[in-house]
Amino acid sequence: MLDNPLIQQVLFEVMEEDVVGFDVLNVLIDSNEVTDDEISRQLEVKLNNIRRILYKLYEARLVDYNREKDEETNWYTYTWKPSLEKLPALVVKKMKNILDELKKQLSTEENGMFFYCMGCELKFTFEDAMDMGFRCPQCGGVLHEYDNKKDMATIKEQIAYIEDEFNQNPLFFKY
């Protein structure tokens, strides 16, 4: 399941781009139940980093934990386990938001006129370019009309890719 690109993208976002999170998830899946200290030792990563990742995964409801108190030391031990059955629904929710944004962006690209500064590589709407007298606010260079066909093609490809994943991957069928 973790090899699906959409799932990887969502997990990467959940873990705030911390790639160690994938290693943590793999340890959890392989062990089924493990302490944060054991994960830290196994991956040779600081315990605080492991806990930070686990808390992010817990906030997304992708892991659960049990807490046990050691009567001698009065310290708590947290045993973590994966709870990935909610992952496909989370992916669908986040990807639908991304699809909505991509469709809005595509509509803007299709219905707008844009200008571009070749020196600074900045893109402006017609309205913004007109307000600036068709001059770049950074370098003062002349803004040229921008052909956004490549941008639209890229957005359409992204939309098609996500929709194809939804339609072809059985993980997402019931959502």
From Swiss-Prot:
Transmembrane segments: none
A single MF term (Gene Ontology): DNA binding
Alphabetical list of Pfam families matching this protein: TFIIE_alpha
Classification via PROSITE patterns: HTH_TFE_IIE
Function noted in UniProt: Transcription factor that plays a role in the activation of archaeal genes transcribed by RNA polymerase. Facilitates transcription initiation by enhancing TATA-box recognition by TATA-box-binding protein (Tbp), and transcription factor B (Tfb) and RNA polymerase recruitment. Not absolutely required for transcription in vitro, but particularly important in cases where Tbp or Tfb function is not optimal. It dynamically alters the nucleic acid-binding properties of RNA polymerases by stabilizing the initiation complex and destabilizing elongation complexes.
Family: Belongs to the TFE family.
Protein name per the record: Transcription factor E
Taxonomic source organism: Methanococcus vannielii (strain ATCC 35089 / DSM 1224 / JCM 13029 / OCM 148 / SB)
